[in-house]
Amino acid sequence: SEALAKELGVKVKLQATPWDGILAALESKRLDAVVNQVTISDERKKKYDFSKPYTVSGIQALTLAKNVDTIKTAADLAGKKVGVGLGTNYEQWLKDNQPKAIIKTYNDDPTKFQDLRIGRIDAILIDRLAALEYAKKAKDTAAAGDAFSRQEAGIALRKGEPELLEAVNKALDKLRADGTLKKLSEKYFNADVTQ
């Protein structure tokens, strides 16, 4: 967000906002943009404008390492207790793709991860990059199988601000062309996740 703001010639003011209220904060004009790995979906595009994608990832199941072989596909989630963030695309994806899963929603990540590690839930659905990063730190967990779907994240903006959308896209194009996006990606994710 800081590189983007610099490119746009504006001052950035980072504002910590709970995920389940972040898009509402955009709608109510408490935020001008959401730069927080917001997955671009058809449903969200009805309400918000999105920049060109700046990261690409996927929906990943995170399990205890000892259970990693129990989940390879979405079909394997049937009958399992699966933790997801309340109001996230992971919750919606699970409802749409595996209605036989037992969905447990969470308002915060620490409780969700704790419930996985103590066995209250069988898996968590999160971003593949986050799953790999978490499993690196918590050796008793592992990313199970391949990512379930490709996800592109963009900067969410209010509808009806075409000049801002165009400026953001031009800034992202420049940051991609000069290698800044790739460098930031490798710094934070240890991989180029910009394509």
What are the functions of these language-model segments?
Residues S1-E7, N67, K81, L86-T88, ...:
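Extended ligand-binding regions for polar small-molecule ligands
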Residues S1-K6, Q60-Q114, A123, R128-L132, ...:
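Bilobed "Venus flytrap"/periplasmic-binding protein-like clamshell domains
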Residues K11-Q15, A33, Q60-L62, K81-G83, ...:
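Soluble periplasmic/extracytoplasmic beta-strand elements of cell-envelope proteins
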Residues K13-A24, D69, K104-Q114, I118, ...:
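Short helix-initiation/N-cap motifs at beta->coil->alpha
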Residues A16-G21, K29-R30, K81, N89, ...:
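Conserved functional loop/turn residues at catalytic and ligand-binding sites
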Residues G21, N36-K47, L94-D96, R117-S149:
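A ligand-binding cleft/hinge motif common to bilobed small-molecule-binding domains
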Residues V56-T63, R128, L132-D173, F189-Q195:
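Periplasmic-binding protein-like
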